[in-house]
Amino acid sequence: MIQPRTLKGFRDYLPAAMIPREQLMQTAREVFRSFGFAPIDTPTLEHLEILTGKGSDETDRQLYSFEDNGGRPVGMRFDLTVPLARFAAQHIGTLGTPFKRYHIAPVWRGEKPQEGRYREFVQCDFDTIGTTSELADIEAVCVIDALLRAIGIDAFTISINNRAILTGLLESLGLADKTTPVLRSLDKLGKIGREKTANEMVESAGVTAEQADAVLRLAECDGDAESILASLPEITGGNETAAAGIERLTQIYRGALASGVSPDRLKIDVSIARGLDYYTGVIFETTLDELPGIGSVCSGGRYDNLAGLYTKQHLPGIGASLGLDRLLAALESLGRLSGVSKPCAVFVPFFDKGHRDDYLKLASQLRDAGIGVEVYPEPKKLGQQLKYADSQGFAVAIIAGGNEWEAGAVQVKTLATKESQDVAYSHESPDALIEAIQAATS
C-alpha cells in the first residue's frame, strides 16, 4: 500500500486553513480593483530562458526546471513579476499603457523550508506597466497600506528605499561594476549583522574593507525620515545618480503621507537592497511590528529594464507582492484566524424523513436570501447531528421536527451559547426566519 504523504515544503490545505486563505485573497482582489488593477493569469510553466534571463544566481539555484516531453528546457515560475514582463512584452500592443494588473497564483522555489516559508506558495501581486511617473510609485505604497489595513492589521511598517542611492554611492566608490554582488551581500545585513556582511562584501564582491565600510555607513543611516533624507547627499558624496534617487525617494515619501499613509507606518530604510537583480529604483518591504522575525510580508519595487529582455519597447514597471502564506502564518501565530471550517454559518439537521422536502425548501429560501446553509444528508439522531455542527464551526442550527412543522415555527439555536428561540416559519412566510438568522450571524 502506498503511504499517503506530501513532499517536504509542500502542504495540503484543510477547510479550516483554506477558508481564511480565500477570504484574504478576496480582500486583496477588492483592494486591487479599488485602485483600478485588472486580473490576469499566466502559465505555470515558462521557457527556461524566460525565467533565468534576469534573476540571480540564488534564484536560478532555486528554480524547479526540467525538460518537457518535447525536449524543451522549461521551468516553474518562481515569482509573478518575470512572467509579467514576458506577458507585457507579448501583449502590450493590445493592452495599451499604463497597464495595471493584479495576479494571485502559486509560485515554486526550491528553498529550505522554515516557519512561514514553503516551496510552493501563493503570491498576490499588483503592478503598473508603462510609466515612470512618481505617482505610480506613490500609489504602490498606498496599495500596500490599504491592503494590510483591509486585512485587519494595524501595526505594520512599510520601509522604502531607492536603489539609485546605493548605485550612486557605488559609482562614487569606483564599484559600479560590482553593484550586483555588493547589493546582494547588503540584502543580508538584517539577517547576519554588520561584521559578516562586511566580510562577505570583501570576499564575494572583491571590495576593500574601507569600501565595504562606506556602503554600510550609508545602510546604517538612522533617524526620522526627514533627517535621513537631509543627510544622504553628504553621505553619497554629491553623486548625480544618488542625488536623483534621493529626490525621487523624497517625492514618494511625502506623496504617500499626503495620500493618507500614516507616518507611523512609513519608514525610510536605506539598508534595503532586495535580492533580485531587476530592481532599478524605489524598493520597499513591509514587516509586522508584532512579528518582525517572520520577515517581509509585502515587498517589491521599480524595475524599469526588466521587459527589455523580451522587447525593444521601453516598458518600465512598479509593483509589489503580498506573501499570502507568510502572512497567514503570521496571523495564525498572533491568534487572529478563526477556527471556522465551513463556508456557511447555518446548519439544518435532518431527522424527520417525512419532512425531507420541507428541509430542502427551507434551505433554498435561506440561500435565495444570501444565507449559506448546509443540510445534514442522513436522518441520524438530533444529538449526533448537533455534535457534528459544533465540531464544524457552524454558528446557528435550525431545528424542525414534526411538531415544529405542524406548529408553523422552527427553533433557532445559537451553537456557541446553546441559546434557542422559537421563530415563526412557513414556506409562504419565511421573512421572520431570515431576519432571525441574519441577526444571529451578524
Curated annotation (Swiss-Prot):
InterPro entries: aa-tRNA-synth_II, aa-tRNA-synth_II/BPL/LPL, Anticodon-bd, Anticodon-bd_dom_sf, His-tRNA-ligase, HisRS-like_core, HisRS/HisZ, HisRS_anticodon. Pfam families: HGTP_anticodon, tRNA-synt_His. It is an enzyme of class 6 (ligase). It is found in: Cytoplasm. It catalyses: tRNA(His) + L-histidine + ATP = L-histidyl-tRNA(His) + AMP + diphosphate + H(+). GO terms for cellular component: cytoplasm. Its main location: cytoplasm. Its EC number is 6.1.1.21. Disulfide bonds: none annotated. GO terms for molecular function: ATP binding; histidine-tRNA ligase activity. One of its GO terms (biological process) is histidyl-tRNA aminoacylation. It comes from the Bacteria. Keywords: Aminoacyl-tRNA synthetase, ATP-binding, Cytoplasm, Ligase, Nucleotide-binding, Protein biosynthesis. Homodimer. Belongs to the class-II aminoacyl-tRNA synthetase family. PANTHER family: HISTIDINE--TRNA LIGASE, HISTIDYL-TRNA SYNTHETASE. This is Histidine--tRNA ligase. It comes from Rhodopirellula baltica (strain DSM 10527 / NCIMB 13988 / SH1). The gene is hisS.
